[in-house]
Amino acid sequence: MNKYASVFHFFSLFLIINLIYPSVSLGGHSVARSWNEVALEAIRKDFARPVVHARNLFHLSVAMYDAWAFYDSVSTPYLTGRIAECSFQKVDFEGEKESAQIEAISFAAYRLLSHRFSQSPNVIQTITSFDSL
């Protein structure tokens, strides 16, 4: 895969998450947008590592998209269930779909970002900002 295809995939996932996902009461922004903003703030407080942070943003977008896609009947997760080490069978969900999606997105984002920024120089501030969502 060339570098332009990777950039296209990242921005495609970013747009899907931020433009299609319905807004919630977090200042009129979607939960995905709120997590992206918190991630960008964590990057600003961390060491300057552009490649690492580009990967962090991509993985965050994939994790949030997959969490959203689990509860959507027509969407296919980007990563989960598509590699040998990560088997997944989609289940039919009965219940409040939007709140389940918000919870799943937040759980995925929190776990990923908490792990990725656990060695950050401002870890206390960073984790506190994650906890605020």
Protein language model annotation of sequence segments:
Residues H9-I20:
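Bacterial N-terminal signal peptides
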